[in-house]
A protein has these predicted regions:
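Short glycine-/acidic-enriched loop or helix-start segments at secondary-structure transitions
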Residues: 6-8, 32-33, 67-70, 90, ...
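Flexible active-site lid/hinge loop adjacent to a nucleotide/diphosphate
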Residues: 1-73, 116, 176-180
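Short, hydrophobic beta-strand segments that form beta-sheet elements in well-ordered domains
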Residues: 56-61, 77-82, 225-227
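N-terminal leader/targeting and accessory segments in enzymes
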Residues: 56, 64, 90-92, 118, ...
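ATP-dependent carboxylate-amine ligase
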Residues: 19-20, 45, 74-77, 108, ...
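Short, polar loop motifs at secondary-structure junctions
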Residues: 61-65, 83-84, 232-233
Length: 277
């Protein structure tokens, strides 16, 4: 979370004073203001300390850095969520793409979610939201019904159109982990169909090169990648291009990117435009 103001360098969320907080994952980001992961963990520790004893912390049980945050001091009841049956809240995927999963609470199945969202990250998001609502007394059956009606938000694998058998998605890709899990969910849904990615490193952290080494692996499931490497990038985009498994090409501007996509795309393809610009 970004800092509050030029005179208050604490992350904005320390002012929220939540009764229930979801800690979904913790990775290095916002390289323009944080020097390292430890600095981000300190801010999360401050957030944890603001949640009262009568509140609840819902924590991704798979995340080692969040476990380290809790070890810094936590006096609020904690419930873990994830894919592990030992967690208080567990998701058991019924479809590989994440569009259907069973919800298990303390070893007992409480319902099934079927929705249009894809990817493990969305399964965890939905599970955490359900756990948070249950923590404040919302009926689980009502939560399940609400999740089934949820149609996601803008720019999160949003289908913007289909033309000549080509489906185009808009995705707010801000971090390699999010890119990887988003594409993995799409791959599970479309099977062997071609996935073509138009990638722009647009966030401050991306442009500074903080995630450069992780970018190529995050694109592993793509069959083709068109990488928008603007001349002002301060890091070597060619090194990333060379490490991408699929057919990859760098272009210098948006017009060249569109021209390359037109040449690449064919009926049956899934074209994902990934940029947070």
């Amino acid at each position: 979370e970004y800092d509050t103001a030029f005179f208050d360098k604490r992350s904005k969320f320390v002012h929220y004073r939540p009764l229930v907080a979801i800690l979904n994952n913790l990775e290095f980001d916002h390289a323009d203001i944080f020097p390292d992961v430890a600095a981000i963990q300190r801010q999360f520790h401050h957030l944890v300390r603001t949640v009262p004893r009568r509140g609840r912390l819902l924590v991704n049980g798979h995340d080692e850095r969040l476990r380290e945050v809790l070890a810094m001091g936590c006096w609020t009841p904690v419930e873990r969520f994830g894919f592990d049956a030992s967690f208080e809240w567990c998701a058991r995927k019924l479809r590989d793409d994440g569009s259907a999963f069973a919800v298990v609470h303390c070893g007992r199945e409480v319902g099934i979610v079927e929705w249009p969202l894809l990817g493990d990250h969305n399964v965890l998001n939905g599970l955490a939201a359900l756990a948070a609502c249950a923590a404040v007394g919302v009926d689980v059956a009502g939560i399940l019904a609400a999740l089934a009606r949820f149609r996601s938000v803008k720019r999160r694998m949003e289908v913007v159109g289909t033309h000549a058998g080509i489906t185009v998605y808009d995705d707010f890709a801000h971090h390699p982990t999010a890119i990887a899990t988003t594409l993995a969910g799409l791959r599970a849904k479309v099977g062997d169909a071609r996935i073509v990615v138009a990638m722009e490193p647009r966030s401050n952290s991306m442009r500074l090169g903080a995630h450069a080494d992780a970018l190529a692996p995050s694109l592993d499931v793509a069959d083709a990648v068109v990488f928008l490497a603007r001349p002002e990038l301060p890091w070597d985009a060619d090194k990333v291009i060379a490490a991408i498994r699929g057919d990859a090409q760098a272009v210098a501007d948006a017009d060249a990117l569109v021209a390359r996509l037109r040449a690449l795309a064919r009926a049956g393809d899934h074209v994902v435009v990934m940029s947070n610009g």
